[in-house]
Amino acid sequence: RVGASVQSPFVPTLRLDATQPLGETIAALNKFQPEALVAYASVGRLLALAQLEGQLEIAPHSVFTSSEVLTEESRSLIAKAWGKPPMNVYAATETATIAAECEYRVGMHFFEDLVITEVVDDQYRPVPPGEYGEKIFVTVLFSRTQPLIRYEMSDSIRLTDEICPSGKPYALIDGIQGRHEEVLHLPTPSGETVAIHPNVFHDVLDLIPTGGWQVILEPTGLRLLLVGVRNRDDELKLLSALR
């Protein structure tokens, strides 16, 4: 069952639907007062904003983010809200945790005693450290119910040869771009195409105080929807950054 790995009869756990209204989530968290907060990266950012604005009043000892790319802006915002940077985790429903940051946060350590992870290009050839792959293969070593051998995931990640100050021997991920199929391929005036990764929009739009945003790919180009842009200066700043 999805999320079963975080359920325990010995540890009080509150599971919330990320799609429910934010106000309901805030009210539930204020009542529950979690000691550890685990959230999608985008939801963690929204909760951090709510904490800074005084709507959310919790004091977790640890904050974990997962399932989405954690931008530096979101990391800083979460650290500001709760006095500690989040611990980023790389996981999938099918495989459980694949890698996670340690206290030094210089990258994410593979759980090499639990999963074997291979970074490959679009021709399934191994990709060396320092380069982003097109996808990964994951072999799960602990699942006896549903064996997964070289399970293909379209995540684009980059390894590094650097050694973590912690001294842990596990290989490090130093970059995650997310799912390869989320990359937009747009025409250029010269008739060629250019690849635009969703992180480009995060890097720009996360800096603007909005209630949310959505980018829609249409036959004639991109349409950007914004919620709650507070003033004209923010609009001009956003247009300048996008250009």
Each model region followed by its residue ranges:
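Active-site glycine/GP-rich loop and adjacent strand/helix microenvironment
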Residues: 2-243
